[in-house]
A protein has these predicted regions:
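A conserved mid-domain beta-alpha-beta active-site/ligand-binding segment of alpha/beta enzyme cores
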Residues: 131-141
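Non-catalytic, C-terminal membrane-associated alpha-helical segments of glycosyltransferases
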Residues: 143-206
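Active-site donor/metal-binding and catalytic loop motifs
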Residues: 98-119
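A short acidic, glycine-rich active-site loop
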Residues: 117-129
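A structural signal for well-ordered alpha-helical segments within the folded catalytic domains
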Residues: 83-84, 126-133, 181, 185
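A recurrent flexible, glycine/aromatic-enriched loop bordering the glycosyltransferase active site
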Residues: 40-61, 119-122
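Conserved donor NDP-sugar-binding/catalytic core segment of glycosyltransferases
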Residues: 1-27
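A short, conserved alpha-helix in the catalytic core of glycosyltransferases
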Residues: 59-70, 75-101
């Protein structure tokens, strides 16, 4: 295809459940460890955007990249796993997101519409826990690649927690009490992961 001839990691676009374009946060602010919510949606003159993250839904990988960086890390279980796989891939190639639509959401999800520009979607307490806990694994990979900045990453964690509290208040208020508990528990457990002496990154397949 016109993309696979020159690019090794490709992310297709998608439609939202209502048939409109689904905005996917392709720009990952590595020092903070958070997606950039205001990255331009347009693809520009090149017809694609270089990215440093990924979504497993619709992601296409060249075998060379997988061999080089290894398999996705199953310890994440859910959340940030594909983000960090895209980050790892960006260390050996330039992943891109393209305008070709390959997926469409079919389930409506409760959300808070932010000025008609972005949406904050409903999620589960299990997700809330892993959003916070898995920042521990994220930090370990940043350490592995020399990108870990403790103070800036700590700020990113505070911003992530604040976003989840806002999500609880604006979208998932019926889970406010249990949600706050899971955010705090995940944050606590992330600290333990950051200092786990037995942790090792996923190995290369070479």
């Amino acid at each position: 295809s016109k993309w696979t001839d020159k690019h090794e990691v490709i992310q297709g676009s998608r439609f939202d459940y209502d048939g409109g374009p689904f905005y996917w946060q392709y720009d990952f602010i590595v020092p903070l460890g958070i997606p950039n919510p205001i990255a331009p949606a347009a693809f520009g003159p090149a017809g694609y955007r270089v990215m440093d993250t990924l979504c497993f839904e619709g992601g296409l990988f060249n075998r060379r990249v997988v061999t080089e960086i290894g398999l996705p890390d199953p310890r994440f279980f859910i959340y940030w796993d594909d983000t960090m796989y895209g980050y790892r891939a960006s260390k050996v190639t330039n992943p891109i997101v393209v305008p070709d639509v390959i997926l469409r959401r079919t389930r409506e999800i409760g959300n808070w519409d932010i000025a008609g520009v972005r949406q904050l979607n409903s999620t589960s307490d299990m997700n809330r826990y892993h959003i916070m806990r898995n920042r521990g694994y994220m930090a370990r990979y940043f350490m592995t690649y020399g990108d870990f900045r403790p103070l800036v990453f700590g700020l990113g964690t505070v911003l992530t927690a604040a976003k989840e509290v806002i999500r609880l208040v604006m979208v998932d208020r019926e889970h406010l009490k249990t949600g706050l508990v899971q955010i705090a528990k995940g944050w606590w457990d992330s600290r333990k992961l950051m200092h786990d002496p037995t942790w090792k990154p996923m190995p290369s397949l070479k």
